[in-house]
Every structure is written in structure tokens, then in C-alpha cells.
């Protein structure tokens, strides 16, 4: 498989549109009534809460680069809170969720601010977001929507407020137990079937966080590796037990397993698309989650695959114990890789040859886990070759180098 880019705070590294400045140099927010929103689903366009939901939905579907929209949402939430009794406004779980998540999103913009003031600003916004979601849960303690929002805020907060201040040799910057905080977020997470996007985003943030933890201290070396043909990955940077990320790293396998289980739960509530829905957003989302699941199983297979390969092909005079370990590792790796293939197939698109290549590469990985030159191995390599040939033809030779490598390995 191709090397995966790190999820090192991708959002806060993107270019952001800052609020316009007034004549006095102060940042100006955009009032809600100056932002045009379209109300869907037959909602009352004069209803302030309906307008707020529409604006939030529009923001989520945008590039999320305009801080003014978030400021408009937060200001409107403040107004609704102040005037709820006077105007007879009923504020439900969605209102509290939007309010909290908008504050959390604003914290992302503050990560661009330098120095102590910037760090404090990030913390203040996350404090406000956490307070708001907890207040919502006081009113709606059984709300899955608010529980999910709380999980997302925690998953965002750990890398942006705490991990960003750390280095391998600097343990200052995290005055809370990060492992305990992450477990709190996991406990709060819910799969809300009626809003798959709201479910998937916290999981993406969680996945990015696991990569940050695993690769902490070697980001530059990995970035250089992504831009080169180097095969060897940089060695893991060891952390002292006193480091705030030490415990998180020790629990990485169980965190990865939790992520996989939540992706599975999300995938189960998605409808399998039909041929007529090839280009629909729902179909693209279905394939995206299928791809993530396939990758999660492939990642899980990596360690037993290495054990099998090392003991089988790189160990001279292996002992009986080594052979037993190799067989067990082979069995585990094969099962995980077979599961990965199932999901990569689900992620295939008739219009995207890269998805065929992704599946082909997993067939090769599974072939490498078979007895050398066995019928099963040859069959898997053949299936990979067929997909590679098809993709290569569809792209006028884009994958020729991969196909040539596969064919050379079979001769």
C-alpha cells in the first residue's frame, strides 16, 4: 500500500480567512442576518433556531475557512439564550450541540496565534465549548447528539491544546491526564444513525490523534520519507514514563481496536449504494468509510505480518517455538488481511482506478502471507494482476511501474 500522510493537525494548517478588520483595527464578526442561508426540509425560514441549524449545516458542508461564519453562529447562540424567554424560543439538544461545537471550531483558528496569548486563547475556547456541552447535558442527559459533541470536543482538544505544546524532551504543556481524558471522550462517543457525518468526523480526528501519538517526535523524518523512495521508516522516539504521551502510546493498540469497532458500527448503519447512486454523496461517504475500515484491518495485520516474514524467511535455523510463532502470526495476519480485502472491495468505484489498485495491493499482501509458490498464492497474485492491468489500461499506463514490479516478482 502507498504510504499514508500523517494527520498532524491538518485543519489548523490550512489557510484560513480571517475576520475583516474595522477602522479601529478590531476584528468584526458577521451578524447572522447578514449571512444568507437556505432552509431545507420544509422548516420555517422565520424560525431563528431553524435558521441557526441551516447556517451550521452550511458551514459543515463548506471548506470551513471563514471564521466570520462561526462568529455569526456563536453570536446568534448568545442572542437566543438571552432572549429565549422573551421570544418564547425552545432551545433543544441541537442548539446546545451547535453552540458547543462552534466554540470548539473557533479554537482551531486560534492555533495560528503565536506565543502564550495564542495558547491561552485556544484553551479558553475549549473551556467554553466543554462548559456549553456539559450544560446541554444537564438539560438533556440522555442526548446522544450532545454526548457525541462532547466526544468530538475532547478529541479535538487533546492534539490542539495539549500535544501541540509538547516535544520529546519537554513534558510541560499538559496539566491533565491525557489518557484519562481520551477515555472520557471514548465513553461519550455515540453512533447517531441519523447523522453519519457527525459520527465520522470525531472518528477521523481520533484516527489523526493516534497517528500523532505513534509518530510523535519523528514527524519531519516521516515527511521526508513521504517525499522520497526510502523504504525504511524512522525509528520510534522513546518517551520517558513521566511524559504526558507515554501512557497514551502504551494504549495505542486498544485505542486502534476501539476506532475499528466504532467504524464498523457506523458502517452498519449506512445503506449499501446501488448502481444508480454511483455519484451520490451518500455513495462517496459509504466508500470512504469502507476504505477506512479496510485500512484499519490492514494496519492491524502489519505486526503479525512482520513476525511471520521475519521468522519464516529471515531467521536461520528457526526453533520449533519460532515455527509455532510464525504459524500463529501467519494465521492472524491472513484473517485480518482477508477482512481488509472485503472492505477495500466495498470501497471500489467504477470511475476511480486508484480504488482498484488499492484492492490489488491488498491481494498482494495476502499472497505474501501464503506458502511460497502455493496455488493460493498464485491465485491471489493473479487477481491482483488482473486489477492492476485494468487500472493501468484505464489510466494510460499510470500504474505501469507497480504492474511491472508484480510481474517481475512472479518470474
UniProtKB/Swiss-Prot annotation:
Function, as annotated: Required for correct translation termination and probably involved in regulation of hypoxic gene expression.
Transcription is among the record's keywords: yes
Residue numbers spanned by region Disordered: 1-45
Any one Gene Ontology BP term: regulation of translation
Protein source organism: Eremothecium gossypii (strain ATCC 10895 / CBS 109.51 / FGSC 9923 / NRRL Y-1056)
Name by which UniProt lists this protein: Enhancer of translation termination 1
GO annotations of cellular component type: nucleus
Origin superkingdom: Eukaryota
Keywords: Nucleus, Transcription, Transcription regulation, Translation regulation
One Pfam family cited in the UniProt record for this chain: Nro1
Biased composition (Basic and acidic residues): 18-39
Subcellular location: Nucleus
Gene that this sequence comes from: ETT1
The family this protein is said to belong to: Belongs to the ETT1 family.
Amino acid at each position: 500500500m502507498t504510504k499514508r500522510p500523517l494527520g498532524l493537525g491538518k485543519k489548523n494548517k490550512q489557510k484560513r480567512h480571517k475576520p475583516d478588520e474595522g477602522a479601529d483595527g478590531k476584528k468584526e464578526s458577521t451578524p447572522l442576518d447578514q449571512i444568507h442561508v437556505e432552509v431545507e426540509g420544509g422548516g420555517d425560514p422565520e424560525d431563528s433556531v431553524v435558521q441557526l441549524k441551516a447556517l451550521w449545516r452550511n458551514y459543515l458542508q463548506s471548506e470551513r475557512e471563514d471564521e466570520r461564519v462561526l462568529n455569526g453562529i456563536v453570536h446568534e447562540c448568545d442572542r437566543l439564550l438571552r432572549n429565549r424567554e422573551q421570544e418564547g424560543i425552545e432551545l433543544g439538544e441541537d442548539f446546545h450541540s451547535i453552540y458547543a461545537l462552534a466554540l470548539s471550531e473557533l479554537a482551531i483558528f486560534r492555533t495560528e496565534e503565536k506565543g502564550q496569548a495564542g495558547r491561552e486563547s485556544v484553551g479558553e475556547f475549549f473551556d467554553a465549548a466543554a462548559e456549553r456541552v456539559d450544560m446541554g447535558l444537564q438539560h438533556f442527559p440522555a442526548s446522544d447528539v450532545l454526548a457525541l459533541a462532547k466526544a468530538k470536543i475532547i478529541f479535538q482538544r487533546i492534539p490542539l491544546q495539549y500535544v501541540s505544546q509538547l516535544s520529546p524532551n519537554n513534558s510541560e504543556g499538559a496539566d491533565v491526564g491525557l489518557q484519562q481524558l481520551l477515555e472520557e471522550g471514548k465513553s461519550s462517543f455515540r453512533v447517531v444513525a441519523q447523522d453519519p457525518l457527525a459520527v465520522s468526523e470525531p472518528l477521523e480526528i481520533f484516527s489523526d490523534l493516534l497517528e500523532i501519538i505513534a509518530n510523535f517526535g519523528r514527524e519531519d523524518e516521516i515527511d521526508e520519507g513521504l517525499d522520497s523512495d526510502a523504504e525504511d521508516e524512522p525509528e520510534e522516539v522513546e518517551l520517558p514514563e513521566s511524559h504526558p504521551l507515554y501512557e497514551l502510546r502504551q494504549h495505542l493498540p486498544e485505542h486502534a481496536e476501539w476506532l475499528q469497532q466504532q467504524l464498523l458500527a457506523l458502517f452498519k448503519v449506512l445503506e449499501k449504494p446501488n448502481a444508480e447512486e454511483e455519484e451520490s454523496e451518500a455513495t462517496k461517504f459509504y466508500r470512504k468509510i469502507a476504505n477506512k475500515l479496510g485500512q484499519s484491518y490492514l494496519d492491524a495485520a502489519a505486526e503479525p505480518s512482520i513476525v511471520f516474514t521475519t521468522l519464516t524467511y529471515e531467521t536461520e535455523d528457526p526453533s520449533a517455538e519460532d515455527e509455532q510463532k510464525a504459524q500463529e502470526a501467519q494465521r492472524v495476519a491472513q484473517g485480518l488481511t482477508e477482512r481488509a480485502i472485503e472492505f477495500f472491495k466495498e470501497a471500489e468505484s467504477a470511475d476511480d482506478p486508484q480504488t482498484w489498485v488499492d484492492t490489488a495491493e491488498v491481494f498482494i499482501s495476502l499472497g505474501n502471507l501464503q506458502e511460497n509458490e502455493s496455488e493460493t498464492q498464485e491465485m491471489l497474485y493473479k487477481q491482483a494482476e488482473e486489477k492492476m492491468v485494468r487500472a493501468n489500461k484505464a489510466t494510460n499506463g499510470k500504474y505501469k511501474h507497480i504492474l511491472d514490479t508484480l510481474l517481475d516478482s512472479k518470474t
